[in-house]
Amino acid sequence: MRTVLLVLALSAASAYGQDAGKEIQRYREMVAEGSPAELFELEGETLWKKPQGPKNVSLEKCNLGKGPGVVKGAYAGLPRYFKDADRVMDLETRLLYCMTTLQGRTREEVTKRAFGNADHPSEMESLSAYVAGQSRGIKMAPGVSHPKEKQSIELGRALYFHRVGAWDFSCATCHGDEGKRIRMQELPVLYKPAAARSTAATWPAYRVSTSSFVTLQWRMNDCFRQMRTPEPTFGSETTVALIHFISATGAGATYNGPGNKR
């Protein structure tokens, strides 16, 4: 009898999980129509063209990897190695570089409010929305050939499985097994191409539950916070490497963001 009850319970849980998954997908499709992310894209375009900083220049000569000022398809090619900075950069790290070198602003000024909220979105978030949106429909192809790109991806892979902090958590603790959820939120297994493609193709994103636009640097930072470890420096080698590993694993996906998240 106990065996029968256990089988019934497991079957019910499985059915519930499948139904919940369908409802979550339906919900995402509904909120994708007329996404508020479009408003952040528009604001980001304004900021891209706005003269700022001690040098009073815009970001229109910022080289995101496709040449000075070229935003079309740039996000799809990130993270990648930049010779002028001699390091691998993701979108936000590169924007920070351009703000400091082209506009003459300080790192402290730019990163003071790198992450905004519903009432006060950050400049970095809006710029990320604009640049990312210019890769819509383009296949994701982050840099993977330069020696420092290869090092970055391997570092990201090692960090993904590295346990740390008081709770002895790693990224794989939550994102390591199929079918895991936190409440109604599915936890994709990001070291597998299928899940990584879905993630790479939709970030950055508008977060419905907080009415705010969030970026991958924010996502990495918040994961470290939830693991009860010190939050990383904005644009650190650690966060860029993790983003690079996930992006490289998900290479080939057609970018369809900025997306919508719970």
Label for each model-derived stretch:
Residues L159:
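Secondary-shell segments that build the walls of catalytic and ion/ligand-binding clefts
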Residues I138-L155:
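Solvent-exposed, charged amphipathic helical/linker segments at domain boundaries
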Residues Q18-L39, K49-S126, R136-G137, H162-R262:
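Electron-transfer interface patches adjacent to heme c in soluble/periplasmic c-type cytochromes
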Residues L8-G17:
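Hydrophobic h-region of N-terminal signal peptides that target proteins for export
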Residues L127-V131, G143-V144:
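Hydrophobic, well-structured mid-protein blocks that either form specific transmembrane helices
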Residues L39-F40, Q151:
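An amphipathic alpha-helix/helix-turn recognition signal
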Residues M1-V7:
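Sec-dependent signal peptide recognition
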